[in-house]
Amino acid sequence: MSMDVGVVGLGVMGANLALNIAEKGFKVAVFNRTYSKSEEFMKANASAPFAGNLKAFETMEAFAASLKKPRKALILVQAGAATDSTTEQLKKVFEKGDILVDTGNAHFKDQGRRAQQLEAAGLRFLGMGISGGEEGARKGPAFFPGGTLSVWEEIRPIVEAAAAKADDGRPCVTMNGSGGAGSCVKMYHNSGEYAILQIWGEVFDILRAMGLNNDEVAAVLEDWKSKNFLKSYMLDISIAAARAKDKDGSYLTEHVMDRIGSKGTGLWSAQEALEIGVPAPSLNMAVVSRQFTMYKTERQANASNAPGITQSPGYTLKNKSPSGPEIKQLYDSVCIAIISCYAQMFQCLREMDKVHNFGLNLPATIATFRAGCILQGYLLKPMTEAFEKNPNISNLMCAFQTEIRAGLQNYRDMVALITSKLEVSIPVLSASLNYVTAMFTPTLKYGQLVSLQRDVFGRHGYERVDKDGRESFQWPELQ
């Protein structure tokens, strides 16, 4: 039996992607480190109409021998050491010209390293992130490939068939560029995901602090969803999480430890943004907000050692309906904050493209987020259109200036209310407001003073607005 493509790793993502591809009519060879898992997979799907398109192999040698040449293998194992180990095993059984595709959440620089190592061995490589989770892998995820165009063209028919389709029928995949471009896009996709999930978490915290129960919070979010602007997968899962009940009928949120895990992509994105000098405070604070949660013991000790230090007057809504004035303020705040997060994310990608020469087509990349992935939602369509209309737009927020003008005062008022009346931490909502304010301020006065401060103590010099070059002031000696 000559198989079209191989899948290595039958965890949740690998198993579901293998089923997805097989259902599209391709013959899929599967291999797992433990053959018992492969047997379980085959048994569980023996009655599927496309079961004849699946075949499991006990050894890597048999797996490789089953594949049509040039062989194509999708690697779906844990990023890092497991990926390196799997790659080394495949190198031993694959031949010159064969293709390895790493789909893990890898750092884009690691993908560049793997590509060089494999090319030196005569193999071809593609880094291709996947978004959409278990359901996406099975029904159609978004893919983010990067590497050599000729390699992409060989794997393209399989990937496009398996990908989610947007409303216009276009598959949610595009070749993002050379080297680690695909993994870089996936990194910033995940950083945007971090930030927007955190915004919804902060909204939940705010509304609960204002006296709403979980079902009332969910009702507010349902109303916001009906307005379409915020309609998204992340809003849907926020509503589901708020409504979820434990076995005893109580809200599940009340039994969940407030520690948020992470896989590292958000941190990598924040680090890269800082290194290349792109302001991305919401993406950075989304990482910090998770770090806050990991300090559970310290937070408990602080609250015990200094009781009441964050005590505030409190604020209970008189009108808990979605039409209430404070809820309208919060709605406007969230709309602008999410626009701000996307603006930062895309600005990072634009600058990363300049630094690393990926050859990124940003409108095409954004279009791949419209379905199948965690970021999917209404806003991706007008954002794609904004970049298609003006690829050189100074900042995505300019395309949404009508919404920002209409809601910015409400945003400011809401942040003021939260910080003065509620014991609620809002790291990303506050960072997003600061980003909007800073990026629309032609002259930042603090920039003038701090430039002079640096000249006083370090003779670093400063630029003037009335002539080119740098100069230093003759400062009097300070005691």
Swiss-Prot record:
Family matches, as Pfam families: 6PGD (PF00393), NAD_binding_2 (PF03446)
Q: What is its EC number?
A: 1.1.1.44
Q: Name one GO cellular component term.
A: cytoplasm
Q: Which InterPro entries match?
A: 6-PGluconate_DH-like_C_sf, 6PGD_dom2, 6PGDH_C, 6PGDH_Gnd/GntZ, 6PGDH_NADP-bd, 6PGdom_BS, NAD(P)-bd_dom_sf, Pgluconate_DH
Record-level GO BP terms: D-gluconate metabolic process; pentose-phosphate shunt
The entry marks the following residues as binding NADP(+), namely G9, L10, G11, V12, M13, G14, N32, R33, T34, V77, Q78, A79, N105
Q: Which UniProt keywords apply?
A: Gluconate utilization, NADP, Oxidoreductase, Pentose shunt
Q: Which reaction does it catalyse?
A: 6-phospho-D-gluconate + NADP(+) = D-ribulose 5-phosphate + CO2 + NADPH
Q: What class of enzyme is it?
A: oxidoreductase
Which pathway does it operate in? Carbohydrate degradation; pentose phosphate pathway; D-ribulose 5-phosphate from D-glucose 6-phosphate (oxidative stage): step 3/3
Q: Which residues form the active site?
A: K186, E193
Q: Which residues bind substrate?
A: N105, S131, G132, G133, H189, N190, Y194, K263, R290, R454, H460
- GO molecular function terms listed in the Swiss-Prot or TrEMBL record: NADP binding; phosphogluconate dehydrogenase (decarboxylating) activity
> What role does this protein play?
Catalyzes the oxidative decarboxylation of 6-phosphogluconate to ribulose 5-phosphate and CO(2), with concomitant reduction of NADP to NADPH.
Assembly information from the UniProt record: Homodimer.
Membership in a protein family: Belongs to the 6-phosphogluconate dehydrogenase family.
Q: What is this protein called?
A: 6-phosphogluconate dehydrogenase, decarboxylating
Q: Which organism is it from?
A: Trypanosoma brucei brucei
